Amino acid sequence: MNPTVRHPTGPRFPIAVPWHTPYYWTLVITFVRVQRMGRRSTHTPDQLRELILDAAQAIIVANGLAGLSAREIARRIGYSPGTIYNMFENLDDVVLHVEARVLDALDQRIEEAMRVDATEDKVVALAESYLAFTSERPKLWNLLFEHYMPSGADTPPWYQQKLEMLMSRVETAMAPLFAPEDHVALQRSARVLWAGVHGITSLATANKLASVTTDASAILVRDLIRNYLAGLAANSESTQRKVG
């Protein structure tokens, strides 16, 4: 190889530099750094955060949580891994923000589904929207339950608020069945019912029980909700008769 010709895989410089000399590789390193600096200047911090989250979400959808790494995110967005840690505390922080996106999307789907009047129809619509969401985005939904914070690390308050918002949707749908002063009973019943819906959803998504398939899960959820709400109504009537 002619020593004055650039390295076959290296960048082209305006002057002839022997590729096997230290000076050539100094130029290469400088060239790469300048290129990266140029890319960085095109993105604001907010845009860069979104790029990181977009890449992380795409990796999780393709390969699950196990396939996520700072190096892979960096490769996809064209920045160094260190850039990720300038934007987020650590990889767990990145995952939490991806989870927040999932929770926001789920909350929007549920809110749209609840635009019906009858209490039972509202709860059924809420549960069916949950089922549909998990069926459409299984790896993102599984992320909510696969990811654990490191030992000693607390889940941030903003994340807890998003979880509580979802549960408040269930409470809002069931509220007409309870007297205003029965808030504790409403909370308990909402959690009991939603635990049942989540159990059916988990079995359907795992696809390990022949009797709980994705198709059958919608019927099972409707039966669960109608029977549970009927039981609440019967208990309420019984209580009223005793009081009377």
Residue ranges, per PLM feature:
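Amphipathic alpha-helical packing segments from all-alpha helical-bundle domains
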Residues: 153-178, 187-192, 219-230
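Append "Primarily bacterial transcriptional regulators
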Residues: 68-75, 84
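Hydrophobic alpha-helical connector segments
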Residues: 111-140, 164, 180-181, 189-193
